Amino acid sequence: MKTIVLLFVLALVFCTLEMGIVEAGFGCPFNQGQCHKHCQSIRRRGGYCDGFLKQRCVCYRK
């Protein structure tokens, strides 16, 4: 049971570290393509608008 909990916590931490959050908008909420292009410009795979009223640009890694 302890190993399952430990693996779950490690997976949760790993998934959290895989996302880079950009707070300044970068086109969100009206231009998700601009957010995606911004994320690619900082060597991420892409991005999308997220958060309250889609005002935050979230980048995902390669």
From Swiss-Prot:
Negative results: has no inhibitory activity against Gram-negative bacteria. Shows very weak inhibition of the potassium currents mediated by the Kv11.1/KCNH2/ERG1 (11.6%), KCa3.1/KCNN4/IK/SK4 (3.9%), KCa2.3/KCNN3/SK3 (7%), Kv7/KCNQ (5.9%), when tested at 1 uM. It comes from the Eukaryota. Transmembrane segments: none annotated. This is Defensin BmKDfsin4. The keyword Metal-binding does not apply. Disulfide bonds join C28-C49, C35-C57, C39-C59. Dual-function peptide with antimicrobial and potassium channel-blocking activities. Shows inhibitory activity against Gram-positive bacteria such as S.aureus, B.subtilis, and M.luteus as well as methicillin-resistant S.aureus (MIC=0.1-20 uM). Does not act on bacteria by disrupting membranes. Also moderately inhibits Kv1.1/KCNA1 (25.2% inhibition at 1 uM), Kv1.2/KCNA2 (30.5% inhibition at 1 uM), and Kv1.3/KCNA3 potassium channels (IC(50)=510.2 nM, 61% inhibition at 1 uM). Inhibits potassium channels by interacting with the pore region. Does not show hemolytic activity. Keywords: Antibiotic, Antimicrobial, Calcium-activated potassium channel impairing toxin, Defensin, Disulfide bond, Immunity, Innate immunity, Ion channel impairing toxin, Neurotoxin, Potassium channel impairing toxin, Secreted, Signal, Toxin, Voltage-gated potassium channel impairing toxin. Changing R43A: Important decrease in ability to block Kv1.3/KCNA3 potassium channel. Residues 1-24 form the signal peptide. GO terms for molecular function: potassium channel regulator activity; toxin activity.
